């Protein structure tokens, strides 16, 4: 009898990707979640994967049950039922830790850039050889015959500790998730523990002073722009069609590469992938060829045009990510005004990084702020308001509501960059509807 996988919280980005991967590998998959639409569910619907409302009746003793990390007996009827009846289940990261043992696995960790880098590595490697992968934008691909497995390795609550990949990239270390991590040193300790679990090769951004402290039994390869790294990206040419650059390895030239994405951070992401695939024995000519066709990942600098107005949707919700996204927008649209529409995500992060958010948003030409999107894990004690952030921004700034985004029309020759990890897309859709009243020409 074929095993049935049931996902509690199937619309989560990691969960939906895993569900898609298992489905493509020939397994029977279903899941449950809230009614609210999430961008991840489109892929599930296209695959014909059943999405059910939460209900204790969904839980059967003979199912392989995978539970999202946010769900507990006190907030989910399915978890409560499973606990009451002695029905076992695994958390996402627990399942993944055992699943990857059947593959040569490539992890991508880091405070920022995980999803984009996982996307680049998955795209290139799956075009070279049969590869299964999980990307944090909700994309998953499974193949029963795959030898290689690429996955995103999340540090939140140390979820990456069950993972023991052969190879891993670590893009950076930064203080984030202040609801869990107590300090930058706490974040470092988590990554350092993870690094000790890598068995064959660790690829680290060498210009991050925290990452330079990392130790591992596996060989460590540093990548970056500066000469002190093993893999060095140099002779950069950033244009409106993407980024071209050369890479050298310990003084040996590996050639020129092009990636049709924007921002210095994506050059680094690509360099990490080049280094990993070079060390693990893949043909760099094939790597070079497939980098050229990378089309990006969901909610990372995703563009559309409405009546000649460029709208960019991005998941950026940390100051470092905001800076990178605005840098990418200026690279592609150097002659346009860059208008940022940002929704802070979680009260704890907003309080902890209020000054840093203001500094990052000042990189835009004008800023619009949405109300803070609180996490289900926290309570709003009134300690911070979005107006507190607005007061610290020196550029033109205004707080807008989802019901009235008309102030955004006060710009000519502008690119609108919507950023956030909450429901910022509702503001984006509201703006698109406003523009559609002016025209029906949507590309």
Swiss-Prot record:
Q: Which UniProt keywords apply?
A: ATP-binding, Cell cycle, Cell division, Cell shape, Cell wall biogenesis/degradation, Cytoplasm, Ligase, Nucleotide-binding, Peptidoglycan synthesis
Q: What's one Pfam family the UniProt record gives for this protein?
A: Mur_ligase_C
- EC assignment: the record states 6.3.2.8
Which reactions appear under catalytic activity for this entry?
UDP-N-acetyl-alpha-D-muramate + L-alanine + ATP = UDP-N-acetyl-alpha-D-muramoyl-L-alanine + ADP + phosphate + H(+)
What is the protein's known function? Cell wall formation.
Biological-process GO terms, alphabetical: cell division; cell wall organization; peptidoglycan biosynthetic process; regulation of cell shape
Which family does this protein fall into? Belongs to the MurCDEF family.
Q: Which GO terms describe its molecular function?
A: ATP binding; UDP-N-acetylmuramate-L-alanine ligase activity
Q: In which pathway does it act?
A: Cell wall biogenesis; peptidoglycan biosynthesis
The record, for InterPro entries, names: Mur-like_cat_sf (IPR036565), Mur_ligase_C (IPR004101), Mur_ligase_C_dom_sf (IPR036615), Mur_ligase_cen (IPR013221), Mur_ligase_N (IPR000713), MurCDEF_pg_biosynth (IPR050061), UDP-N-AcMur_Ala_ligase_MurC (IPR005758)
Name of the protein described by the UniProt record: UDP-N-acetylmuramate--L-alanine ligase
Q: What is the lineage of its organism?
A: Bacteria, Bacillati, Bacillota, Bacilli, Lactobacillales
Annotated residues for binding of ATP: 110-116
Species in which this protein is naturally found: Streptococcus gordonii (strain Challis / ATCC 35105 / BCRC 15272 / CH1 / DL1 / V288)
Q: In the UniProt record, what gene is named as encoding this protein?
A: murC
């Amino acid at each position: 009898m074929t095993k049935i996988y049931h996902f509690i919280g199937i619309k989560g980005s990691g969960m939906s990707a895993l569900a898609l991967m298992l489905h493509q590998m020939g397994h029977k998959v279903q899941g449950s979640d809230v009614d609210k639409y999430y961008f991840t569910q489109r892929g599930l619907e296209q695959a014909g994967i059943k999405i059910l409302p939460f209900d204790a009746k969904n839980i059967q003793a003979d199912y392989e049950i995978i539970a999202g990390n946010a769900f507990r007996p006190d907030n989910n009827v399915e978890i409560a039922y499973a606990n009451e009846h002695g029905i076992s289940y695994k958390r996402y990261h627990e399942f993944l830790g055992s699943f990857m043992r059947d593959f040569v696995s490539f992890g991508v960790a880091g405070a920022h850039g995980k999803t984009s880098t996982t996307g680049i590595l998955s795209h290139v490697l799956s075009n070279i050889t049969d590869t299964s992968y999980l990307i944090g934008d909700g994309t998953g691909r499974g193949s029963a015959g795959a030898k290689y497995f690429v996955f995103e390795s999340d540090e939140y609550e140390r979820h990456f500790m069950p993972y023991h990949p052969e190879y891993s990239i670590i893009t950076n270390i930064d203080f984030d998730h202040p609801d869990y991590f107590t300090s930058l040193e706490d974040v470092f300790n988590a990554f350092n523990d993870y690094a000790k679990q890598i068995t064959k090769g660790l690829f680290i951004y060498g210009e991050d002073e925290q990452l330079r402290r990392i130790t591992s039994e596996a060989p460590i390869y540093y990548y970056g722009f500066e000469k002190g790294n093993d893999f060095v990206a140099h002779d950069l040419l950033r244009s409106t069609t993407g980024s071209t650059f050369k890479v050298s390895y310990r003084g040996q030239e590996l050639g020129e590469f092009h990636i049709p994405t924007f921002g210095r951070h994506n050059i680094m992401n690509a360099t990490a992938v080049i280094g990993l695939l070079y060390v693990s024995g893949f043909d760099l000519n094939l790597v070079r060829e497939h980098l050229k066709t990378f089309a990006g990942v969901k909610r990372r600098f995703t563009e559309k045009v409405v009546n000649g107005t460029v709208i960019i949707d991005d998941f950026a919700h940390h100051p470092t990510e905001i800076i990178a996204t605005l840098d990418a927008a200026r690279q592609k649209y150097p002659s346009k005004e860059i208008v940022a529409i940002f929704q802070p995500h979680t009260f704890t992060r907003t309080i902890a990084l209020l000054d840093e958010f203001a500094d990052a948003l000042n990189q835009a030409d004008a800023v619009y702020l949405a109300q803070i999107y609180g996490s289900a894990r926290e309570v709003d004690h009134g300690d911070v308001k979005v107006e507190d952030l607005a007061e610290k921004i020196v550029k033109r700034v205004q707080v807008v509501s989802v019901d009235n985004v008309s102030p955004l029309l006060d710009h000519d020759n502008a690119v609108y960059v919507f950023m956030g990890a909450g429901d910022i897309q509702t503001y984006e859709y509201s703006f698109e509807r406003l523009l559609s009243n002016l025209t029906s020409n949507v590309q």
